[in-house]
Curated annotation (Swiss-Prot):
<comment type="function">
    <text>Reversibly catalyzes the transfer of the carbamoyl group from carbamoyl phosphate (CP) to the N(epsilon) atom of ornithine (ORN) to produce L-citrulline.</text>
</comment>
<keyword id="KW-0055">Arginine biosynthesis</keyword>
<feature type="binding site">
    <location>
        <position position="232"/>
    </location>
    <ligand>
        <name>L-ornithine</name>
    </ligand>
</feature>
<feature type="binding site">
    <location>
        <position position="107"/>
    </location>
    <ligand>
        <name>carbamoyl phosphate</name>
    </ligand>
</feature>
<feature type="binding site">
    <location>
        <begin position="236"/>
        <end position="237"/>
    </location>
    <ligand>
        <name>L-ornithine</name>
    </ligand>
</feature>
<dbReference type="InterPro" id="IPR024904">
    <property type="entry name" value="OTCase_ArgI"/>
</dbReference>
<feature type="binding site">
    <location>
        <position position="320"/>
    </location>
    <ligand>
        <name>carbamoyl phosphate</name>
    </ligand>
</feature>
<dbReference type="InterPro" id="IPR006131">
    <property type="entry name" value="Asp_carbamoyltransf_Asp/Orn-bd"/>
</dbReference>
<feature type="binding site">
    <location>
        <begin position="274"/>
        <end position="275"/>
    </location>
    <ligand>
        <name>carbamoyl phosphate</name>
    </ligand>
</feature>
<dbReference type="Pfam" id="PF02729">
    <property type="entry name" value="OTCace_N"/>
</dbReference>
<dbReference type="GO" id="GO:0006526">
    <property type="term" value="P:L-arginine biosynthetic process"/>
</dbReference>
<comment type="similarity">
    <text>Belongs to the aspartate/ornithine carbamoyltransferase superfamily. OTCase family.</text>
</comment>
<dbReference type="Pfam" id="PF00185">
    <property type="entry name" value="OTCace"/>
</dbReference>
<dbReference type="GO" id="GO:0019240">
    <property type="term" value="P:citrulline biosynthetic process"/>
</dbReference>
<feature type="binding site">
    <location>
        <position position="83"/>
    </location>
    <ligand>
        <name>carbamoyl phosphate</name>
    </ligand>
</feature>
<protein>
    <recommendedName>
        <fullName>Ornithine carbamoyltransferase</fullName>
        <ecNumber>2.1.3.3</ecNumber>
    </recommendedName>
</protein>
<feature type="binding site">
    <location>
        <begin position="56"/>
        <end position="59"/>
    </location>
    <ligand>
        <name>carbamoyl phosphate</name>
    </ligand>
</feature>
Length: 335
């Protein structure tokens, strides 16, 4: 019997270390089958609702292509396409959609929303992103890390994350590191560290799995010996402009540039980013940021690093498809 059948995928700590590895193994298998043209459809006849209270490129495309590859059909409910939480409660929306669909993806705001959907839908619910967690991204990250260091197990790898570690990526990295026994360094000013109680709980789990979680303001200490450097955008478009100035000033020293890569002491170090990235001035926002905050070479990462051989961000982006497909197949297929 499939251990994942009809389960939700809301956050990584809902799973055991062995289950996370099993999902990664399934993703590897599905990716291989797709590349070789011998993929077997296990979701034929399934209907999937994709709720997006926040717009997305990678998450939407990954869920849609994964569903189509497996023979399922999707309905996209965008920011203006549903009444969830406005004219209809989350609880009622869950019970309606659960009668019509075999699985529901939610990408939006509070974790409580996706948890309520899961509580009342009666079908598998998957977290495409909330303010608190981004578990599908971390599955893609772990798969990418395994692919680029095939002779090293996850519990022997070291990852340093630079920037604002209080966000959903910081939280999910903490959970992932604790589960797989990784050496995780969160490198950031103290004002940008995650909630202390949550860090302590993840460190306690990491002790059991052989992992190590370190928080430091010292860049050289944090990145020394790292196999992977990771960062994310420093500001979100929905945040007020005054927040931008304060945070960018705070995080400028933590930009991932060639100097930081050199500090790792690892000439083979790889760079990760969940995208989109402000690495140049070729977008409207990127140009505005570069001019307003004196960041001509990029914001959280420089163009030089982003376009270098160290960067594996597009392998990482592709793996969103394969890991999301693994979650869908695992939770909606009996075998």
């Amino acid at each position: 019997m499939n251990q994942f059948y009809k389960r939700h995928f809301l956050r990584l700590l809902d799973f055991t270390p062995a289950e996370i590895i099993a999902l990664l193994d399934l993703a590897t298998e599905l990716k291989k089958d797709k590349k070789s043209g011998c993929e077997q459809q296990k979701l034929v006849g399934k209907n999937i609702a994709l709720i997006f209270e926040k717009d997305s490129t990678r998450t939407r495309c990954s869920f849609e292509v994964a569903a189509y590859d497996q023979g399922a059909r999707v309905t996209y409910l965008g920011p203006g396409g549903s009444q969830i939480g406005h004219k209809e409660s989350i609880k009622d929306t869950a019970r309606v959609l659960g009668r019509m669909y075999d699985g529901i993806q939610y990408r939006g705001y509070g974790q409580r929303v996706v948890e309520t959907l899961a509580e009342f839908a009666g079908v598998p619910v998957w977290n495409g992103l909330t303010n608190e967690f981004h578990p599908t991204q971390l599955l893609a990250d772990l798969l990418t890390m395994r692919e680029h260091l095939p002779n090293k197990s996850l519990n022997k790898m070291t990852l340093a994350y630079l920037g604002d570690t209080r966000n959903n990526m910081g939280n999910s990295l903490l959970e992932a590191a604790a589960l797989v026994g990784m050496d995780l360094r969160l490198v950031a000013p103290k004002a940008c560290w995650p909630e202390e109680a949550f860090v302590i709980s993840c460190q306690a789990l990491a002790q059991k799995t052989g992992g190590k979680i370190t928080l430091t303001e010292d860049i050289a200490e944090g990145v020394n010996g790292a196999d992977f450097l990771y960062t994310d955008v420093w500001v979100s478009m929905g945040e007020p402009k005054e927040v931008w100035q304060e945070r960018i000033t705070l995080l400028k020293p933590y930009q991932v540039n060639m100097r930081v890569l050199t500090l790792t002491g690892n000439p083979q170090v790889k760079f990760l980013h969940c995208l989109p990235a402000f690495h140049d001035d070729q977008t409207t926002i990127g140009k505005q940021m570069a001019e307003q905050y004196d960041l001509p070479g990029g914001m959280e990462v420089t163009e030089e690093v982003f376009e270098s051989a160290h960067s594996i961000v597009f392998d990482q982006a592709e793996n969103r498809l394969h890991t999301i497909k693994a979650v869908m197949v695992a939770t909606m297929s009996k075998i």
